[in-house]
């Protein structure tokens, strides 16, 4: 097996058995201990496992996310690839809504369509879009979150009642087979409200977000139309998404669709 295939298989094993050891990886995949350790290091870097003495377990509840600068730097190449693929889903004249995700920021940067109207809760995305002459920008009001460079609160949700868009682009801090999750109530409320004012919901999620569960559940997969990601999904995750009629776009090479 190639490494990525082993990594997916290791996660599947952990979902069934809760814990895996270096020796088990060596036995299951006929690899050396050094290769088994490299696989675990890779999964740990992706946030998909927690390493223990001699092995690994799946991560438990994630309690925090980094500030804006930290999130922007994390998995930056994956986010760039996903952002470009998501921007390719936008057509001339589309009315769009964008949340304050750093992956969505890359979609805003890559946007090449003309005559778009964009509603956003992100001051960074609004600033980027000012460089695009044929784009009209609406910024939601509310409380400014200095840590995440975005607005939130009752005023922002109330303002959404003035808009309805063709497409909503959102990121997520965590995605499991139960759906999307966020670290705080404000994010959950705002994203849910945005979904009520969009014909199509497009979620941008790099590989590090899978298997990560945060305190507040946002929505299940029935509320999503398209998922744009950068790596192959586990069979269980793919089955859950397709059962909810979610279109999967792999942002690698020639964008693949399921």
Which residues fall in each region the model found?
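HTH-adjacent hinge/linker in prokaryotic transcriptional regulators
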Residues: 2-23, 27-28, 34-100, 108-113, ...
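Conserved phosphate- and dinucleotide-binding cores of soluble alpha/beta proteins
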Residues: 2-5, 11-12, 19-25, 45, ...
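Short, active-site-adjacent cap segments at secondary-structure transitions
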Residues: 57, 103-106, 126, 176-177
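Amphipathic, positively biased hydrophobic alpha-helical segments used for protein targeting
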Residues: 65-66, 97, 104, 182, ...
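Active-site-adjacent beta-strand anchor residues
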Residues: 97-98, 119, 184, 230
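Short glycine/serine/threonine-rich phosphate/pyrophosphate-binding segments
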Residues: 103-107, 210-213
